[in-house]
Curated annotation (Swiss-Prot):
HAMAP family: Leu_Phe_trans. NCBIfam families: aat. Signal peptide: none annotated. This is Leucyl/phenylalanyl-tRNA--protein transferase. The gene is aat. Pfam families: Leu_Phe_trans. The keyword Lyase does not apply. GO terms for biological process: protein catabolic process. SUPFAM superfamilies: Acyl-CoA N-acyltransferases (Nat). One of its GO terms (molecular function) is leucyl-tRNA--protein transferase activity.
Length: 265
């Protein structure tokens, strides 16, 4: 039975109390209270995250199974590999980290998505993650072409663990480029797992898979207390982590043609 948190001092419950698979709201473990950095840090360290709609109290979740992306298992399709090779070689194309976090989280909250009428990133959540970003725990990976932000993602870092939150794309493959950059950064910094929270076919096609809650929480216990990466700068040398030079040479079309093509509505 989910726990009602009446006060910011109320502790989050044991995740074993989360509603089970097959219930009306599987994974729901608690409701209520605040979104302070202290509360968020407590939650994420235990594999719990907030997710709710307008008009609802803050809802806290710990799904079982859990969708994760082992960075060693990231799948690069032939077309994405070609795009990344062109992108990484072009001086007017770059990945930036934390250059415009506010724009990234705003775009994640407002970009229309197929099959969704609204957003789960409520204004209170935007404010909470922005505050946590200022404290150094939340980061954005951003796809820039010719000085324009075309896609990106943001997520939480605790120790040697990264929790993906949301992504957006305003041009074909722009969010995939940001995700590939995150994977490369994680490989370079001994972060083995990216939390994806819940299953989607899109993430599954990129190598994400489900693990049970005990396995996920065991990984957190080993990683979140470690020293986090110190340098949150994306260097072009990070692309070598993806071994983009393998396979046939890409066709000669320009990066600008690929990266500035508008995304399908």
């Amino acid at each position: 039975m989910p726990t009602w948190l009446a006060s910011p001092d109320d502790p989050l419950p044991d995740t074993r109390h989360a509603l089970p698979a097959g219930s009306e709201v599987p994974g729901l473990v608690a409701a209520g209270t605040d979104l302070s950095p202290r509360r968020l840090a407590e939650a994420y360290a235990r594999g719990i995250f907030p997710w709710y709609s307008a008009g609802q109290p803050v809802l806290w979740w710990s799904p079982d199974p859990r969708m994760v992306l082992p960075v060693a298992e990231f799948k690069l399709s032939h077309s994405l590999r070609k795009t990344l090779r062109r992108f990484s070689a072009a001086p007017h194309c770059e990945v930036r980290i934390d250059h415009d976090f506010a724009a990234v989280i705003h775009a994640c909250a407002t970009t229309p998505r197929e099959g969704q009428d609204g957003t789960w990133i409520q204004p209170e959540l935007q404010a909470a993650y922005t505050e946590w970003h200022r404290l150094g725990a939340v980061h954005s990976f951003e796809t820039w072409v010719d000085g324009r932000l075309l896609g990106g993602l943001y997520g939480v870092n605790l120790g040697r663990m990264f929790f993906g939150e949301s992504m957006f794309s305003h041009a074909t493959d722009a969010s995939k480029i940001a995700l590939a950059a995150l994977v490369a950064f994680c490989r370079a910094n001994d972060i083995a797992l990216i939390d994806c929270q819940q299953r989607t076919a899109h993430l599954g096609s990129l190598g994400a898979r489900e693990i049970d809650r005990p396995a996920f929480e065991g990984h957190l216990a080993r990683t979140v207390a470690q020293r986090p990466p110190e340098d949150w700068t994306y260097h072009r040398s990070h692309w070598t982590q993806l071994r983009l030079d393998t396979g046939p040479d890409p066709a000669s079309s320009s990066v600008t043609e690929i990266s500035l093509r508008p995304a399908a509505p």
